């Protein structure tokens, strides 16, 4: 008799994805972050659902409702901080996941990579809208500044911004629609994750060597299920340490002041996970140029498969490319730091140099390194 998990129409799908899935025997801990992102997504949806039960999306009561959740709702404070810091964990895992894909050449699975890019944009949009909901000073001014960037689009820009705002400024209509979008997008993300996995399971996982592992596969369960559970426990440990010991470490003190359209904060800045893109935006003096650079800083990932010049897939055996990859990581950390600094010397110059280096590394230096490595190996 066939095992029910192999014959039942629904269980068969689960079985082929999480139990009997053939997986490479040598994938390292860098491959854990996909499952950790799944854990983050489930946790964000659950905590978000409980927050939505008590939150009101009205400009007069939004700030108070968040305070009410923290003060009066049973364990409301931990749900709120798990949700806020869970977003930070989500982005840490997301950036490591993308970095792993870059390092090991996983971008050659073009469908998986492209769906992943759509996912990245969607998660960023969701996080941005979520930051607006508490209706603090940084929520209001962040929403005003970032949505205003669309006015740089020629001809239709101003109309587009007012259409998004639902009026002539960020107000009640904006907050209500942002709440609606913030609620629906995670479910769209979940559907995209299913598509992402569907495409991944068509080809199978990559591995650190970058060569085919068809001759050496092991079942996903129990080997990688136990490995993923360990990763999830470590993630939850890190998150709980953050939430229970310093929940406001990654937040902005300005967001504890209710939104006031008549009072601009001294330094308007987004959450830490958007600072690298914000630094690129600010490093260009022209508004439209800045907006294009901002979009391209993420959209550039779409061009990476076309820029792959090496005969080898992974960077494991390519020391020049490895050096450039870690320079790129250091550059992104520098941009993140600059994004949080005021617009004054020497930060302006550092930001501009780091922005030029970011695009140069991806568009010029890494493809050239691939060609040089081919020549060295006489390939």
Curated annotation (Swiss-Prot):
- What is the protein's major site of localization? mitochondrion
Membrane spanning stretches: 33-53, 77-98, 113-133, 178-198, 226-246, 288-308, 320-340, 347-367
CDD domains per the record?
cytochrome_b_C, Cytochrome_b_N
Q: Which residues bind heme b b566?
A: 97, 196
Residues binding heme b b562, per UniProt: 83, 182
One of the entry's Gene Ontology molecular-function terms is: ubiquinol-cytochrome-c reductase activity
Q: What else is noted?
A: Heme 1 (or BL or b562) is low-potential and absorbs at about 562 nm, and heme 2 (or BH or b566) is high-potential and absorbs at about 566 nm.
Give the protein's recorded name.
Answer: Cytochrome b
- Source species: Camelus dromedarius (Dromedary)
Q: List the lineage, top down.
A: Eukaryota, Metazoa, Chordata, Craniata, Vertebrata
């Amino acid at each position: 008799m066939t095992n029910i998990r192999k014959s039942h129409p629904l269980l068969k799908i689960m079985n082929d994805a999480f139990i009997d899935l053939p997986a490479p025997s040598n994938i390292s801990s860098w491959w854990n972050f996909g499952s950790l992102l799944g854990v983050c997504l489930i946790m964000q949806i659950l905590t978000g659902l409980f927050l939505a039960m008590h939150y009101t999306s009205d400009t007069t009561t939004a700030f108070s409702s968040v305070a009410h959740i923290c003060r009066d709702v049973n364990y409301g404070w931990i749900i709120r901080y798990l949700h806020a810091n869970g977003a930070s964990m989500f982005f840490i895992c997301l950036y490591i996941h993308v970095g792993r894909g870059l390092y090991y050449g996983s971008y050659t699975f073009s469908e998986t990579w492209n769906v992943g890019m759509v996912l990245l944009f969607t998660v960023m949009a969701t996080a941005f809208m979520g930051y607006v909901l508490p209706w603090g000073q940084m929520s209001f001014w962040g929403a005003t500044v970032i949505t205003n960037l669309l006015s740089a689009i020629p001809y239709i820009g101003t109309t587009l911004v007012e259409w998004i705002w639902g009026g002539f400024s960020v107000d009640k209509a904006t907050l209500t629609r942002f709440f609606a979008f913030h609620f629906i997008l995670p479910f769209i993300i979940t559907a995209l994750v299913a598509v992402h996995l569907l495409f991944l399971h068509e080809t199978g996982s990559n591995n650190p060597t970058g060569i085919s592992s068809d001759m050496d596969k092991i079942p996903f369960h129990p080997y990688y299920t136990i490995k993923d559970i360990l990763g999830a426990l470590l993630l939850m440990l890190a998150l709980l340490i953050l939430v229970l010991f310093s929940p406001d470490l990654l937040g902005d003190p300005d967001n504890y002041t209710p939104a006031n359209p008549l009072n601009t904060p001294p330094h308007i800045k987004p959450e830490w996970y958007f600072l690298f893109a914000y630094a690129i935006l600010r490093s260009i003096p022209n508004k439209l140029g800045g907006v294009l650079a901002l979009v391209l800083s993420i959209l550039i990932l779409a061009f990476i498969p076309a820029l792959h010049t090496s005969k080898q897939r992974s960077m494991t055996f390519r020391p020049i490319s490895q050096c450039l990859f870690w320079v790129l990581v250091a550059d992104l950390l520098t941009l993140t730091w600059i994004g949080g600094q005021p617009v004054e010397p020497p930060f302006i110059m550092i930001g501009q140099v780091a922005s030029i280096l970011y695009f140069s590394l991806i568009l010029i230096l890494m493809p050239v390194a691939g060609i040089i490595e081919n020549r060295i190996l006489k390939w």
